[in-house]
Structure formats: structure tokens, C-alpha cells
Curated annotation (Swiss-Prot):
Family membership noted in the UniProt record: Belongs to the major royal jelly protein family.
Protein name per Swiss-Prot or TrEMBL: Yellow-related salivary protein LJM111
SUPFAM superfamilies on file: 3-carboxy-cis,cis-mucoante lactonizing enzyme
Highest taxon above the source species: Eukaryota
Segment forming the signal sequence: 1-18
Tissues in which the protein is found: Salivary gland (at protein level).
Length: 397
């Protein structure tokens, strides 16, 4: 390793709106356990998303291969051995335990853990850029893969390769949600994957090993989004990006809430329509969150009936209780910090903790080259009920 990196230190706990928000991990550069090639450049490794599993105490992280030399596109941190409570806030990323070489996947952007304790990723099948003199990764059709976290060494249990030409521009796939129709019947599962360039939703039917594309006018941007960095303002346009699922009805159907990256509106579609190939979808307009609330990530908590949004340029995390009509007056803020640059991922673990990530990477060309004087990658953790206590989102608890 020829490059030296400096980690900035600051408090592990920040008090925002009366609640302690624990900063889990922070990195200014992403480095890996083990040897790296002489072509390794940590600036080419961009952390995009994560999923935490309390049972194994593993934090799974995705680092898409923008360049082939990225060591692991799916990595993990053992939080029992590398505990941020004990001050180990910038651990090296290790190889995913279900892999032998770390080269089993070409490039992934997000991990999701479902109710059957499976870890899902979408391997987009291609590297964004090529570097001269570096052995390239094999290219293939986008592939959906799941691993069983209940078993030792996390064996691969699902692999579905999407048909030729069924997904346009796979490196522009955004977030996805895994819909286990009946928690006690894991075979009946659907996956909904967003594409923020083509403004489409890709549906995978696991039971029938089939997939199809859904499009709707509400999936596209309705304005230009702004991103401020280092005294300059940038603009971008991106379509449907974040998606989360509400509560099941008696037939196992739910509302799929979704965000368009360049919009402040929120919509939903009943999964009954998404699960029927060729069915016409009827999008529900739920309301507008207000000026400068653009976001690409959201998550629904069934216990508090609250949706949390990790916002793009406001440097904050907000909430809305779904029992209320959505408008700017019903939105509240649970976290705000000037160093939180471009919130990109948010999730809830099985112990009712809310986790969220900023990575300073808006969908702008060469945004991976932005320079940060504070840690670029910041992961935070907070108990949900503590987070919404005293806010507009606390209702009927």
C-alpha cells in the first residue's frame, strides 16, 4: 500500500433534537483486509450501501466496481471484533463470508436482508469504467443473488439471471425491496428493483422464476435536484430510486412507497398490481414533503407506522407518520449535521434500530472525485422510538 490516508476523529455520539445518535463507523478512504494489487487506489472505492444483521453482528457493505481493481464489491465488518462503541470506528473491510475469492460478483450497489434472513444483492454484471493494464471483471447479464444468513458460511441459495436486453443501463439500478408475501413461506417472494435512468421498476417473481418491467409517469423526475459541495452548486436529474414496503393486508399485499430522486413528492402502488405480470398499475399520490427534501432512500417501520427519509442535500434525516396526511407540516427532522453529505442509504434492523449512511456521491459524473476534509462515509445508528420521541412522528405508541 503506497497511499497513506488520514482519519479524522470526532465524538462517537452526537445529540440531535434531544436524542443521542450514535455514529457507528466513519471512513475517509475505503481499505480492505489482506493484500491489494499495486494498481489499488482507495479513491476508486465508493461505499454505497449497507445492511446490518444483529444475529451475526455483521455489517454487510457494498462497494461497486467503478474500476476493476476494487478488491471486494460485497464486503463485511464483524462488529463484535470491530466495535465502534470501543472506538474502532474505521475498520478494514473484509471479504464476505459466503465467498472464497471475493471475485464471485462483478459489481453490486446495495444489500438487503429479508424476513427469511436472506441477504440479497443485484449484481449489475458490468464495471462502470476500465483501467489500463488491469485485468477486467467478466461481464454478464444482471443477476439477482441471495445468501442464507442462517447457515454457516452463508451459502448461496438463489441466483436468477435476467434475460438478454431486459434491463437497460444496469449500472443505473437504484434501491430495491424484497417482498416476502407470507413470512412463513419464503418461496413466495417478489423483488422490486428501481432504475433511475430509464424510470422503470423491475419485478422478479421468485416462485415462477420470471421477471418483467413496470413503467409509470410517476417514476420520472419532475425537476432538477441541487447538490452543494465545497462552495459550488451542482444539478442533476434522476428518476425512481428508493422503495420500501408497508404492512400486509389479509391477502399479503402491501403499499410499495417509492421516491423519485429529483422530486419531493411521495407515491405508492399496491403490490397486488406489481405482482401481476402485464397488470396496469395505479399510482397513488400521497403528498409533497416540502422544498429541498429530495431523497433517494426511505424505510418504513411497521411498529410506529413511520417512514424515514435520508435526504440528499439538506444534510438531515426526516420522518413522516403514515397515519397523517402527507404535507410539509407533518414532516419532522430526527437528525441534522453539516458534515452529513448526501444521504444514500437507510434501513431498520431486527432489533428496531434505524441505521443511515452518507457517502457524498450524488448521481453526477465524476462526483466520486469530490474531496472531503471530514470523513466522507458516515454510518449512524439510533433506536427508532427514541428517535421519534417528541416529534410529529410520535403517534399512538
Amino acid at each position: 500500500m503506497k497511499l497513506f490516508f488520514f482519519l479524522y476523529t470526532f465524538g462517537l455520539v452526537q445529540t440531535i433534537f434531544g436524542v443521542e445518535i450514535k455514529q457507528g463507523f466513519k471512513w475517509n478512504k475505503i481499505l480492505y483486509e489482506g493484500d491489494t494489487s499495486e494498481n489499488f487506489n482507495p479513491d476508486n472505492n465508493i461505499l454505497t450501501a449497507f445492511a446490518y444483521d444483529p444475529e451475526s453482528q455483521k455489517l454487510f457493505l457494498t462497494v461497486p466496481r467503478k474500476y476493476p481493481e476494487t478488491m471486494y464489491t460485497l464486503a463485511e465488518v464483524d462488529t463484535e471484533k470491530n466495535s465502534f462503541e470501543s472506538g474502532d470506528t474505521s475498520p478494514l473491510l473484509g471479504k464476505f463470508s459466503g465467498h472464497e475469492t471475493g471475485k464471485e460478483l462483478t459489481s453490486v450497489y446495495q444489500p438487503v436482508i429479508d424476513e427469511c434472513h436472506r441477504l440479497w444483492v443485484v449484481d449489475v454484471g458490468s464495471v462502470e469504467r476500465n483501467s489500463d493494464g488491469t485485468e477486467g471483471q467478466p461481464e454478464h447479464n444482471p443477476t439477482l443473488v441471495a445468501y442464507d444468513l442462517k447457515e454457516a458460511n452463508y451459502p448461496e441459495v438463489i441466483r436468477y439471471t435476467f434475460p438478454d436486453n431486459s434491463i437497460e443501463k444496469p449500472t443505473f439500478l437504484g434501491g430495491f425491496a424484497v417482498d416476502v408475501v407470507k413470512p412463513d413461506e419464503c418461496s413466495e417472494t417478489f423483488v422490486y428493483i428501481t432504475n433511475f435512468l430509464t424510470n422503470a421498476l423491475i419485478v422478479y417473481d421468485h416462485k415462477n422464476k420470471d421477471s418483467w418491467t413496470v413503467q409509470d409517469s410517476t417514476f420520472g423526475p419532475d425537476k432538477k435536484s441541487k447538490f452543494d459541495h465545497d462552495g459550488q452548486q451542482y444539478e442533476y436529474e434522476a428518476g425512481i430510486f428508493g422503495i420500501t414496503l408497508g404492512e400486509r393486508d389479509n391477502e399479503g399485499n402491501r403499499q410499495a412507497y417509492y421516491l423519485v430522486a429529483s422530486s419531493t413528492k411521495l407515491h405508492s402502488i399496491n403490490t397486488k398490481e406489481l405482482k401481476q405480470k402485464g397488470s396496469k398499475v395505479n399510482a397513488n399520490y400521497l403528498g409533497d414533503r416540502g422544498e429541498s427534501t429530495d431523497a433517494i432512500g426511505l424505510v418504513y417501520d411497521p411498529k410506529t407506522k413511520t417512514i424515514f427519509f435520508v435526504e440528499s442535500n439538506s444534510k438531515r434525516v426526516s420522518c413522516w407518520n403514515t397515519q397523517e396526511t402527507l404535507n410539509k407540516d407533518k414532516i419532522d427532522v430526527i437528525y441534522h449535521n453539516a458534515d452529513f453529505s448526501f444521504g444514500t442509504d437507510i434501513s431498520i434492523d431486527s432489533q428496531d434500530n434505524l441505521w443511515f449512511l452518507a457517502n457524498g456521491l450524488p448521481p453526477l459524473e465524476n462526483s466520486d472525485k469530490f474531496v472531503f476534509t471530514k470523513p466522507r462515509y458516515q454510518i449512524f445508528k439510533v433506536n427508532i422510538q427514541e428517535a421519534i420521541a417528541g416529534t410529529k412522528c410520535e403517534k399512538n405508541l
